């Protein structure tokens, strides 16, 4: 029992350290070639007169920005200049979440969700609910998030781990190579797969997987 409790603690730490910060920010097709502005021109306009940028350029500016302050400025500009577009709220929420402001992130994700209830806004709200311990609500959001990629499987696996459904967690994690996947395999008693998973990832953190 003590070992199980320690393993659960490791799973929660992995949730905080790895899954939650990696929110599904909305992806854009780069349209710079079409609109004729270089990255430098877009970032310069963001700094000096963001109102001249299209919504795609504004969100793109956040994607290419090198620092978080500029990213936040881009998404704030998107919300101000294009208040009906969900992407600014979504990405601004992601920045708040990564900064540890879960409440602020949830408010922005809710606004994004009202603008457009799509798989990504559902997924992000699911992550917030998972972080807040509202597992049933998180599962409802995840159920409407099909199409966001492997992160959905990871999030569902962590949810199953929290519920003690280790076999279900291992079954849904698929071929994902991450510290979280390693935890799932350890808790399911599959140490060989856990080891191969750790070996395959770029930045393995074995400490997360050796708490028992």
What residues fall within each predicted segment?
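N-terminal targeting segments with Sec-dependent signals, encompassing both cleavable signal peptides
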Residues: 1-211
């Amino acid at each position: 029992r003590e070992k199980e409790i320690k393993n659960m603690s490791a799973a929660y730490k992995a949730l905080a350290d790895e899954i939650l910060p990696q929110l599904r920010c909305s992806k854009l097709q780069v349209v710079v070639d079409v609109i004729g502005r270089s990255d430098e021109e877009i970032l310069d306009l963001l700094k000096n007169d963001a109102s001249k940028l299209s919504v795609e350029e504004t969100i793109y500016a956040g994607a290419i920005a090198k620092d978080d302050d500029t990213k936040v400025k881009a998404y704030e500009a998107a919300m101000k200049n294009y208040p009906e577009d969900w992407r600014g709220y979504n990405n601004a929420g992601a920045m708040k979440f990564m900064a540890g402001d879960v409440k602020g992130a949830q408010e922005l994700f809710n606004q994004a969700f009202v603008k457009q209830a799509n798989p990504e806004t559902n997924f992000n709200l699911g992550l917030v609910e998972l972080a807040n311990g509202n597992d049933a609500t998180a599962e409802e959001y995840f159920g409407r998030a099909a199409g966001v990629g492997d992160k959905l499987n990871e999030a569902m696996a962590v949810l199953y781990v929290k519920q003690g459904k280790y076999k279900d967690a291992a079954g849904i994690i698929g071929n994902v190579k991450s510290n979280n996947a390693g935890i799932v395999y350890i808790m399911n008693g599959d140490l060989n797969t856990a080891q191969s998973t750790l070996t395959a990832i770029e930045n393995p953190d074995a400490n997360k997987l050796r708490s028992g």
